[in-house]
Amino acid sequence: DPITGTNWNRMYHYNKNLVTQFAQNHTQYDDATLKSNFKQALIDEVDSKLNGPAYLLNTSKRIALNLQKLAHQADIVLDLHTGPISSKHLYCPTYATDSARYFNIEHVLLIPSDFDGAMDEANFCPWWHLSDALSGQGRELSIAVEAFTVELGSQEKIDLKEALNDANSILSYLNHKRVLQNATNTPADITRYACNLDDYFAYYAPIGGMVEYIAPLGGHIKAGEPIANILRMERYLSEQPLQTLTLDCDAIAILHFASASVNQGTELYKFFTNIFEL
């Protein structure tokens, strides 16, 4: 939100009680009817928020709910993002790991069924939890929705060649899901590296100063290798002005802070750790 600074990608709505009640009260329906009714229930839930007293919704929440209503009508949700200084990566629910192989994105962050307010979670969490609830009753229901956050790199750089690659990447996935007719888009032959959300690691600046970022985005870092230098100009004549920062584990650098000037505690880098091939 440009006024409040609130991240409205963390303002989506989820009512887990709706899932619990639905799983208890709709067991008599076949799979197709159950899925259709649940999709409508999700839309109605969002409508109830949008149609409530207008003074209860700020601008960010209203935008989020309107987007969510559109998304609940779909079977596939791709939330396209860019970051200040970032490599391409994909947020993928663990149940859809196989589908991640159809995007031409080398770095995949596998996320659990916990809801944390994001667009992709608002779409897959209800279906995932419904499937789990019905499984507890002895009924298997496939998860009807796939939702991903597709991080397309740095927002400060426009590269039309990369934009074409990104489009082909998305078309490859959509072709895999049989959205396209007579399409030839297929995934690139690349190695994809994955990391679980709990192993997605934020590295905070231990001191403030001017930063030279060394770890390349998308690059594999070995434990003990330099990731950045921090320069403290006021220490030039009295003590060591340059401090080299290292990481104590192997990692892949995914993004770093947008400025070369940081305070102590600034989120300097984010890394994949405990990496495995997908």
Model-found features: residue ranges?
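Structured catalytic-domain cores with a bias toward divalent-metal coordination
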Residues: 1-278
